[in-house]
Amino acid sequence: MGTRYISALLIALSISLNLSAQKKSKGPIIKEYGAVWAIEQPDFKVDTTKTFRAVFDIMNSPESHDKVNASIETAARFLNMHAQSGVPAENLKAALVVHNQASKDIISDTAYQKRYGTANPNSELIKALQHAGVDIIFCGQSSNARGFPKEDLMEGVQLSLSAMTALIHLQDQEYRLIKF
């Protein structure tokens, strides 16, 4: 084998080992969801003294009825990445405003089972977010338009007049809109 080939192989192996050493980690706020990468020495620094308020506009959902909604898990990533970066948990405020296709993702396991033949894959994530103080707000217009009555919602989910109303109120309270 040539020296060039061995050098290239060693470089590739070194890069591979370095990449495999980098792993996403969950927690400390949401322990089972929201894995994030640690970013060593970022140029754009995180102000660990400020209060972060984020409202997540959750409208999309996977077509599969047995997959966790990645948009909802984004709230767990938000909490975990900032806590891992030194922001105290009490300085992290989050809310989800759920509507449109994502309406199904916040109904109880019983209601989900009746409609889709399986437990709601988002139940544990929603409970963990609520336990961490995240408000889950459901659009009343989607409730009626999509046929998800208040009694079908998971415990603790708040019904609002509309997603628009909730988003305006939260932004008036200095929550910053996160929409993907």
Where are these regions (language model features)?
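A cross-taxonomic marker for long C-terminal extensions/tails that follow the last structured domain
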Residues: 7, 22-32, 112-113, 118-180
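Acidic/histidine-rich, surface-exposed loop or edge segments in extracytoplasmic proteins
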Residues: 47-63, 106-110
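Structural recognition of the beta-strand scaffold that forms the well-ordered cores
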Residues: 53-57, 94-98, 135-138
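Second-shell loop/turn segments in exported
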Residues: 57-68, 113-115, 156
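Histidine-anchored nucleotide/phosphate-binding helix
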Residues: 68-87
